[in-house]
């Protein structure tokens, strides 16, 4: 199976790109969705997180208080490493299972931390959806309702844009309209079909 890693910073347009690929009949494995699934109520990772951090990470219904944990880990690199040590191996295992089950001509692995978590090792080619930091902030603040400061912290915690550009095999600049994004994806889709 030919696997294309799709990455980009917050607000870059990863979701728009992955949805476009899905409309072309290409299966998509989304690392963010997998990351949410592995910490659902009843999953072993959730219990490990509560043990490591305390019950304050749980909401009244027993689910993960994502916002509180996110704010905590962006203030504490040590806590972020603890969380990653718990979740990343479980996430990777689930991603591999889903990639192996794919039946489309190729499969997309969407991951905002494709390079940071070494998920690029699972791929044959890597596509960066790129946007300027100003556009990332504008899109993410509109979409998520987060403050500019929170978004800047997320951007700062991710691999620098220039490094992602160096590591990517393909780069799509998404500073404009969706139509422009889709036009760029058409050519890449054809290339991926003919891998």
Curated annotation (Swiss-Prot):
A single Gene Ontology biological process assigned to it is: coenzyme A biosynthetic process
Which pairs are disulfide-linked?
A: none
List cellular component terms (GO).
cytoplasm
Keyword terms, alphabetized: ATP-binding, Coenzyme A biosynthesis, Cytoplasm, Kinase, Nucleotide-binding, Transferase
Query: Where does the UniProt annotation locate this protein?
Result: Cytoplasm
Per its record, the protein catalyses: 3'-dephospho-CoA + ATP = ADP + CoA + H(+)
Q: Which GO terms describe its molecular function?
A: ATP binding; dephospho-CoA kinase activity
Q: Which InterPro entries match?
A: Depp_CoAkinase, P-loop_NTPase
| First-listed, main subcellular location of the protein, grouped into a coarse class | cytoplasm
Q: Does the record bear Kinase in its keywords?
A: yes
Presence of keyword Mitochondrion: no
EC numbers for this chain: 2.7.1.24
**Where does the chain bind ATP?**
11-16
Xref: SUPFAM superfamilies: P-loop containing nucleoside triphosphate hydrolases (SSF52540)
Annotated function: Catalyzes the phosphorylation of the 3'-hydroxyl group of dephosphocoenzyme A to form coenzyme A.
The family this protein is said to belong to: Belongs to the CoaE family.
The entry's protein name is: Dephospho-CoA kinase
Which source organism does the UniProt entry give?
Answer: Acinetobacter baylyi (strain ATCC 33305 / BD413 / ADP1)
Q: Which gene encodes it?
A: coaE
């Amino acid at each position: 199976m030919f696997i294309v890693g799709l990455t980009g910073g917050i607000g870059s347009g990863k979701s728009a790109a992955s949805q476009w690929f899905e409309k072309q009949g290409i299966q998509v494995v989304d690392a963010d969705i997998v990351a949410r699934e592995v910490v659902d109520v009843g999953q072993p990772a959730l219990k490990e997180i509560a043990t490591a951090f305390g019950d304050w990470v749980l909401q009244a219904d027993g689910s993960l208080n994502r916002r509180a944990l996110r704010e905590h880990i962006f203030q504490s690199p040590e806590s972020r490493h603890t969380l990653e040590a718990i979740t990343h191996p479980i996430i990777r295992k689930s991603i591999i299972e889903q990639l192996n089950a794919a039946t489309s001509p190729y499969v997309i692995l969407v991951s905002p931390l494709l390079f940071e978590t070494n998920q690029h090792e699972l791929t044959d080619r890597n596509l960066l959806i790129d946007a300027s930091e100003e556009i990332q902030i504008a899109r993410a603040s509109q979409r998520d309702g987060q403050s500019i400061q929170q978004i800047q912290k997320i951007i700062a915690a991710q691999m620098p844009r220039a490094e992602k550009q160096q590591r990517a095999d393909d780069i799509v600049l998404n500073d404009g309209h969706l139509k422009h994004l889709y036009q760029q994806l058409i050519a890449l889709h054809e290339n991926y079909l003919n891998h």
